[in-house]
Amino acid sequence: MNGVVLPGDSTVQYVEVSVPEPGHGQVLLEMKASSICGSDIRAIYRQHLGTGPEAYQGVVAGHEPCGQVVAVGPGCRRLSVGDRVVVYHIAGCGVCEECRHGYMIGCTSPSRAAYGWQRDGGHAEYLLAEEATCIVLPEPLTYVDGALVSCGFGTAYEGLLLATRRRH
């Protein structure tokens, strides 16, 4: 399949990558929409790449993906083939305190990875996603709607969860 990577120097590259197969707790999505965030623009111009494990790792870009489930790995219980989903942009470890409270962006594990930055994102024909990061897209919304709200809405929602948790 084809995918887009961000090598820097004000360029993007269209590359050939393998179609992944879902493992335990994972789903394979056929991408229907994947928007471009300001972070992506800054990465293209090398103004925002991060450092160390938080840096862009040369993977398929796109942390605002939306698609349809085409394969389900073992252990998945919520999603089925044909489901329309938005993908939250951070895959946490699922076991640290932040993840257990639903705040994956605050995951403290070295395994925390952002789609399109540390693991392949949505700018390809297919995306391998953790079932835990997928949110069913309500029928009135289009795939483009889902892609446009995936990063910004998810970040705001997690901020509200964190603020509520700290008040109690």
Where are these regions (language model features)?
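Short structural boundary motif marking the start of a folded domain
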Residues: 1-4
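Short Gly/Pro-enriched turn/cap motifs at secondary-structure boundaries
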Residues: 7, 18-19, 56-62, 114-119, ...
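Short N-terminal binding/cap micro-motifs at the start of the first secondary-structure element
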Residues: 10-14, 38-39
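Glycine-rich beta-strand-centered segment in the early N-terminal region that forms part
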Residues: 20-34, 48-100, 133, 138-141
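Cytochrome P450 core scaffold surrounding the K-helix E-X-X-R motif
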Residues: 39-45
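Short, solvent-exposed secondary-structure boundary/capping segments
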Residues: 41, 78-79, 107-110
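NAD(P)H dinucleotide-binding glycine-rich loop of Rossmann-like/cofactor-binding domains
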Residues: 93-168
